[in-house]
Amino acid sequence: MPLRLDIKRKLTARSDRVKSVDLHPTEPWMLASLYNGSVCVWNHETQTLVKTFEVCDLPVRAAKFVARKNWVVTGADDMQIRVFNYNTLERVHMFEAHSDYIRCIAVHPTQPFILTSSDDMLIKLWDWDKKWSCSQVFEGHTHYVMQIVINPKDNNQFASASLDRTIKVWQLGSSSPNFTLEGHEKGVNCIDYYSGGDKPYLISGADDRLVKIWDYQNKTCVQTLEGHAQNVSCASFHPELPIIITGSEDGTVRIWHSSTYRLESTLNYGMERVWCVASLRGSNNVALGYDEGSIIVKLGREEPAMSMDANGKIIWAKHSEVQQANLKAMGDAEIKDGERLPLAVKDMGSCEIYPQTIQHNPNGRFVVVCGDGEYIIYTAMALRNKSFGSAQEFAWAHDSSEYAIRESNSIVKIFKNFKEKKSFKPDFGAESIYGGFLLGVRSVNGLAFYDWDNTELIRRIEIQPKHIFWSDSGELVCIATEESFFILKYLSEKVLAAQETHEGVTEDGIEDAFEVLGEIQEIVKTGLWVGDCFIYTSSVNRLNYYVGGEIVTIAHLDRTMYLLGYIPKDNRLYLGDKELNIISYSLLVSVLEYQTAVMRRDFSMADKVLPTIPKEQRTRVAHFLEKQGFKQQALTVSTDPEHRFELALQLGELKIAYQLAVEAESEQKWKQLAELAISKCQFGLAQECLHHAQDYGGLLLLATASGNANMVNKLAEGAERDGKNNVAFMSYFLQGKVDACLELLIRTGRLPEAAFLARTYLPSQVSRVVKLWRENLSKVNQKAAESLADPTEYENLFPGLKEAFVVEEWVKETHADLWPAKQYPLVTPNEERNVMEEGKDFQPSRSTAQQELDGKPASPTPVIVASHTANKEEKSLLELEVDLDNLELEDIDTTDINLDEDILDD
């Protein structure tokens, strides 16, 4: 099949004319040297200029990264080599290297050497460990030396291109060339080595507009590429992909297949002449330099050609070499999640085509290799050729002996046992095909599913899929698009019925063939099914699985990984990356089986599987059950106390929630349980919970709502003892114990409030409180203290005070007893009464009158409430009250609670 060269522009950096480009091996950086004398470093991920070196005022024709030294080495028209530290931007070294313009710099991959070439027709070797001394000079060219490149397969050998129309191959240590290649009619501008192990090739580009491929062992030209309309300024073999990249002064970059020499693509970004190209092993990025700036494009798919069968045998392609590894060979070695597996790799031989994809058939006996417009089916064990042919795409059926190929954009062929079984033309063409239980064909009109046996249309769906994944049972299918993925259920019984009766069949197929179970807004990169669980890697490098509407994250990946498969007996999921590293993650098959059984509502099977699930995984299962609506089962399964408590609250299981709250000793839990107990009218339990939670406000609410005077009284005493003064004050006040309220205010230093309370409810106490207030205030402001008027001394300022004394005594004598709460509807509310009118005719007893005349304070008086003696009613009420004898408020730790603090601040 033709090379699927998805070409995406990653960076466009406008600048002056670019004379050389380089890519950093580890950072996302592109180095560009400019004609104006500057050198720039661009981050192609963030699209930003990160560093600039002002080298000189003349063109900088060469610049290279030396990553192991954190250097940028530049060569310019001032004949100087400059070395900069790219972290500090400091110039480390500078020296004159040639007597004319410096054209090219090559950095030795292992030794402390750089090679430079110049218009002085010389090539020089420099050793930075020897203070940048010139170790060797290579003479032989008779014109400018435009480019030098070191042989990646032999680091002691390098080649040079010159305007003298020759290519020379040199050896370090020898000042004369090994040999010279001649064939271009004009000056040679560029040269590069083929980095693969299968061909001893060089490529060159020249002013004769031709690109030539040379066999440097036989010293012959094996191919000439024609097509550029102007001088060829750069040419390169890509170190990863089977392509040749050439750039010309005609403004185009041409991409050729390195095996067939077919022109695959032509790029023209409208930035005038192309001057340079750079690529990097391990990356699909290519940097291009133009008159008007530089560009980075990403070529092809980074997904490796790799496949694993159900038994753990992995086959992958490294360039054209096919290799195998077996997970079984690892034995019982300890495997940690996310760590690279130390696999023994076995070479299986080389493939006749460049593999773009490798895929096992369902039973693992055969493996198909696709690429270059062809497919070859091999035996998986020995890599013997079983079948081959031309195809743009290949797809296995669920039946291991069946497969389909897309011969063109209009014809799809189906094969059975390696023999053509059927050929058909889909109604709207075929842009892509997908294997599985049904044959999927994508067209401009959407996705169509066909029956493998008779190619009948099953269903047409208006969707543009990127991937389709079928479950092993054929009941579930995932259709992944560019933005989301859909989970569908395939209703095979309805399809069979419709095929027999022809009911519900339209031009778009059988209407009831699929049922949509869910749509998830996440991008699927790779995926597979285990039971009814769909496992996938996402665009944000997460390893997730989807089951029953729930997404569970297994791991966060630190780089792009591709799913290979799942081996149930190992309980492990295996993934690979583009460098062909294999890692794995634990994923218990028992958990997946349990979730699958629950999804199918097969609870008997789920109960059988449950004992095999380790305790540490039970909570994950419980969360799944909860999301499916099976909260009672989730409560039984979960081992997490927090989760169990939440479930118990939701289910109203008071006993379980109580036990968990006792174990947790958490105030928050006691409060939550108290709310539930109140909603269930379990007031005794609510009272105990509020007590454990030290929730005085809640206890007060409960006591007042139930009309429990006993509880209010004990709460008042306990709250005061523990410093919860707001609650204590309210509890006393509700009982009519205004004297206790007054004493509480005095003890807590709230003397102004105490004075107003006394004036309102206990006029006989006003004088005492005012004196205390005055004494306290005098410590701060003597003048303000003296301005306070004692009502007994200034009766003219407090009209009605004497009458208030009488009414206070009347209230004390006539309102001494409490009414039961059930009498509330019969009592006239205080706001509707005029106590001064009711008590104005009261004649105080002699003792009380004498006390007032003597200026002695009378005993405290309760707040006004309706008086009634109701022993029977009180007795019946007490029978309904909750006994609080066991409520020991003294034991409550209240050090971290201060209910009246906010009010005190107001």
From Swiss-Prot:
Residues 837-870 are annotated as: Disordered. The modification N6-acetyllysine is found at residue 627. GO terms for biological process: endoplasmic reticulum to Golgi vesicle-mediated transport; intra-Golgi vesicle-mediated transport; intracellular protein transport; retrograde vesicle-mediated transport, Golgi to endoplasmic reticulum. The keyword Repeat applies. It is found in: Cytoplasm, Cytosol; Golgi apparatus membrane; Cytoplasmic vesicle, COPI-coated vesicle membrane. Pfam families: B-prop_COPA_B_2nd, TPR_COPA_B, WD40. The modification Phosphothreonine is found at residue 861. It is a peripheral membrane protein. One of its GO terms (molecular function) is structural molecule activity. It comes from the Eukaryota. InterPro entries: Beta-prop_COPA/B_2nd, Coatomer_complex_subunit, COPB2, G-protein_beta_WD-40_rep, TPR_COPA_B, WD40/YVTN_repeat-like_dom_sf, WD40_repeat_dom_sf, WD40_rpt. The keyword Cytoplasm applies. Residues 866-891 form a coiled coil. Gene3D superfamilies: 1.25.40.470, YVTN repeat-like/Quinoprotein amine dehydrogenase. Keywords: Acetylation, Coiled coil, Cytoplasm, Cytoplasmic vesicle, ER-Golgi transport, Golgi apparatus, Membrane, Osteoporosis, Phosphoprotein, Primary microcephaly, Protein transport, Repeat, Transport, WD repeat. GO terms for cellular component: COPI vesicle coat; cytosol; endoplasmic reticulum membrane; Golgi membrane; transport vesicle. Its main location: cytoplasm. WD repeats lie at residues 13-52, 55-94, 97-136, 140-180, 183-224, 227-266. The modification Phosphoserine is found at residue 859. It is linked to Microcephaly 19, primary, autosomal recessive: A form of microcephaly, a disease defined as a head circumference more than 3 standard deviations below the age, sex and ethnically matched mean. Brain weight is markedly reduced and the cerebral cortex is disproportionately small. MCPH19 affected individuals manifest severe developmental delay, failure to thrive, cortical blindness, and spasticity. Brain imaging show a simplified gyral pattern, thin corpus callosum, slight ventricular dilation, and delayed myelination. Osteoporosis, childhood- or juvenile-onset, with developmental delay: An autosomal dominant disorder characterized by decreased bone mass and deterioration of bone microarchitecture, fragile bones, recurrent fractures following minor trauma, and developmental delay of variable severity. Belongs to the WD repeat COPB2 family. Oligomeric complex that consists of at least the alpha, beta, beta', gamma, delta, epsilon and zeta subunits. Probably interacts with PEX11A. Interacts with SCYL1. Interacts with JAGN1. The coatomer is a cytosolic protein complex that binds to dilysine motifs and reversibly associates with Golgi non-clathrin-coated vesicles, which further mediate biosynthetic protein transport from the ER, via the Golgi up to the trans Golgi network. Coatomer complex is required for budding from Golgi membranes, and is essential for the retrograde Golgi-to-ER transport of dilysine-tagged proteins. This coatomer complex protein, essential for Golgi budding and vesicular trafficking, is a selective binding protein (RACK) for protein kinase C, epsilon type. It binds to Golgi membranes in a GTP-dependent manner. This is Coatomer subunit beta'. The lineage of its organism: Eukaryota, Metazoa, Chordata, Craniata, Vertebrata.
